[in-house]
Design a protein with these regions (language model features):
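A domain-level signal for the structural core that forms small-molecule/cofactor-binding pockets
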Residues: 1-127
Length: 127
């Protein structure tokens, strides 16, 4: 699961759909099958209320990425994969970062969870 949180002052400044699709594709194609396709979810929420730094820069903005995944992925995979993903995210925002103050963050959390997901069944039938 990836949750993207972005400041409202970035509205219209980047292609949110393309960003979400890039991340989902990355998880499908570059993660060595570690993330089951049926479990990949990417969502985004605009932050309308926020304070950044000293609250004196009206153009200051952020995009935060929170990843939650089930426990047990090897540490070396996590390091390699999320370093590469963050590099792709940074490149996605390179032009915007050059034009305005922008903070990008990626946090990864291993979580214990309870699941019921019939999307896996649909994917098996489709293949």
């Amino acid at each position: 699961h990836v949750t993207i949180e972005w400041t409202a002052n970035l509205s219209g400044e980047f292609d949110l759909r393309a960003l979400m699709e890039m991340i989902a594709e990355d998880m499908r194609e570059r993660a060595d099958g570690v993330f089951p396709v049926g479990g990949i979810r990417v969502r985004a929420y605009r932050a309308d209320d926020y304070v950044i730094a000293d609250n004196a820069g009206p153009d200051d903005a952020f995009v935060n990425f929170d990843v939650k995944m089930g426990a047990g992925r090897p540490a070396e995979f996590r390091q390699r994969y999320f370093n590469a993903l963050f590099e792709r995210i940074t490149q996605f925002f390179a032009d915007l970062s050059a034009r305005r103050p922008l903070a990008l963050t990626l946090y990864v959390e291993e979580a214990e969870g309870w699941k019921h997901n019939t999307i896996h069944q649909r994917l098996k039938k489709a293949s």
